Amino acid sequence: MPLLEVEGVRRSFGGLVAVDRVAFKVAAGQIKAVIGPNGAGKTTLFNIISGLLKPDAGRITFKERSITGFSPHQIARAGLSRTFQNPSLFVQMNVLENVMVGRHHRTRCGFARCALRFPGQMTEERAIRAAALQHLAFAGLAHLAEFPSGALAFGQRRMVELARALATEPELLLLDEPASGLNTKEKMDLGNLIRRIRDRGTTILLVEHDMSLVMDLSDDILVLNSGVPIAEGPPRVVQSDPKVISVYLGGDLKEDASGGELSAKWIQTP
């Protein structure tokens, strides 16, 4: 059985259909990418899966249990976590405290009660801190633990948000354009981290415009266009699909893939 199954999901905003009849599966241990031009419905799909939006129709199953219409908190509790296009950290907290917030989803006391530091909860708070430090170290951020979040560079904020998502110990991690705004070295580091996350047992579903990264990381790719799936399969199959080539190369696209547009260079990637 797949870890995640999306069946016939549809969502509209007024007269605009954002996603329509979207169906796909994500196997446990897989890195699956969702790609498509701007406005294809990728982030809307992520928002539906993670509970920020409710679908007009369709069903979402996670670990053989329907999570359709669940709140974001319920979905996080079920074992699914996500990051966003624009990192959203608590700027009044340091890096470690931000990651500890994510870890509180896996505790009995929760963030607010632990923050009150009642005697019976101090032991759990120490365990939360230790676990958060481990996730920072895994992401290569241990040296920034006490650093103010508001003073971080953009790429560092992205990595802290990823560490915070990992602190929830998800079985499925959704990454929404994780490479956006990163330089070449940061993208390389991100790719290595995503592989390590998968290698330790976390399944990954990502939306990304950097096609070099997508082709390098993904086991399977779903392509959306105007909210509708047009292709699905391994990278080599998707690269050569006539519908995908038509969508991305139908006009006179000259930009490099790292700029958010697919190019002939990508289509010809060996």
Positions of the model-derived regions?
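Glycine-rich phosphate-binding loops of nucleotide-dependent enzymes
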Residues: 1-270
